[in-house]
């Protein structure tokens, strides 16, 4: 970063044009230089003491970073980033995070603190070289001067703001919106200008024993020492199943046990790895940071890039969750009968494949209600009916067998598969089903490849069992499936475009890059998939060496 020492401040006031011409810092490059310098020097609103203190804080931070002439790249530019920077400036207020992270968070300031806050806010976005836009009189405004910002913000009680930066390596994390609110203060209460999830009217006696509106930018949920009723007070883990068809030991076992006939269940494209796991982990770190621990279930060696020293990662070999009599296995149906046996796994977990990628910020509420009820994303249409038939898709036959069990148990018929997306699972329900259907679980567990008599435990049985027993509900979240027989280039480009625009309303919760039917032989498919992955998730995660 670039430090504005006393000499540079004097140069800015004395000759703004020369300062902007010579400075790599490009201070407030989106504002008018002359107007800023004039306001900086003469405005009664911007107090020298505040600016001196803010400059001192910025300089101290910058010296710690030991960066004299360049801006440090930002890995994750989001609302939490600006809150942290404002706390470094000793700004005072509260913030409100929405239950749905695709909605705007709010930053709430007392009217009596408005002047001090705006000084610190403008210094923050200036020192961070951020671009500011906001909605004013029904239009998105690009302010040209500090005076313009000051005049606009002193005339309104709340405003939607957008901050953006060119200091990230990925355009998907280069901007965000939030709402800035100014609260009126009465002798007995504080009144927020808009309704929020906690309380629009905050009685002062309810915060007499905490630091809300007294110190720092704090979470409004600190109104109580207890969790809010909509918040989740349980951990959620993440489980991947992963295979690498280039693993030498895996290849030897596969050749030994592969049946003579060919089907989609034995196609090598089902086991192809193009480092999707790496990109899936990047997507979860970027968009699903609420996860406690990540378990990766496999019968292959870990990829060379994976950092197993990361405390959040645990590699789980098949023999840790499956009996020796069932090994080796090449059937996802078999592996999925045993996920609840992972040592140390939380009761609540999300089951995902390496080809499922998150496309927007998510939290626990996207997968479970706060009372523990799971959220399902069943397909909008049904296609499970009839009897198991040789030669028909193995996933369909597995669902048909599961359907037979469900009809006997609940006296209802089901038809909908789960979408190709991360699945909300509970170990207590899986243990319950295993105890109730031991023969079907054991038979599926011991099939080396997907077979006609399998049950699809995580693909079908679990979701409808949980739904019919009152422990799951359908979710309206959109997901996207991309296969080689689709217009895959158009689909992938659409996700990239929506991501760059941060169009969360239209973005799916996740996208699945679904291999199969020898898709690994399709060169255009392979090229477009790699391009998509590297465009959407270019930044290494903390899980990589």
Curated annotation (Swiss-Prot):
GO BP annotations listed: polysaccharide biosynthetic process
Ranges in a coiled coil: none
Keyword Transferase annotated: yes
Domain of life, per lineage: Bacteria
GO MF entry, a single one: transferase activity, transferring phosphorus-containing groups
Pfam families according to UniProt: Stealth_CR1, Stealth_CR2, Stealth_CR3, Stealth_CR4
Record flagged with keyword Lyase: no
Swiss-Prot/TrEMBL keywords: Exopolysaccharide synthesis, Transferase
The EC number(s) this enzyme carries: 2.7.-.-
Family under the similarity heading: Belongs to the stealth family.
PANTHER family documented for this protein: N-ACETYLGLUCOSAMINE-1-PHOSPHOTRANSFERASE SUBUNITS ALPHA_BETA (PTHR24045:SF0), PTHR24045
The protein's role, per its UniProt record: May be the polymerase that links individual UDP-N-acetyl-D-mannosamine monomers. In serotype A the capsule is composed of repeated units of (alpha 1-6)-linked N-acetyl-D-mannosamine-1-phosphate.
Note: Stealth proteins are part of a protein family that is conserved from bacteria to higher eukaryotes. Family members were first identified in microbes as proteins that help pathogens to elude the host innate immune system. Microbial stealth proteins are involved in the biosynthesis of exopolysaccharides. Stealth proteins are predicted to function as hexose-1-phosphoryltransferases.
Protein name: Capsular polysaccharide phosphotransferase SacB
Source taxonomy: Bacteria, Pseudomonadati, Pseudomonadota, Betaproteobacteria, Neisseriales
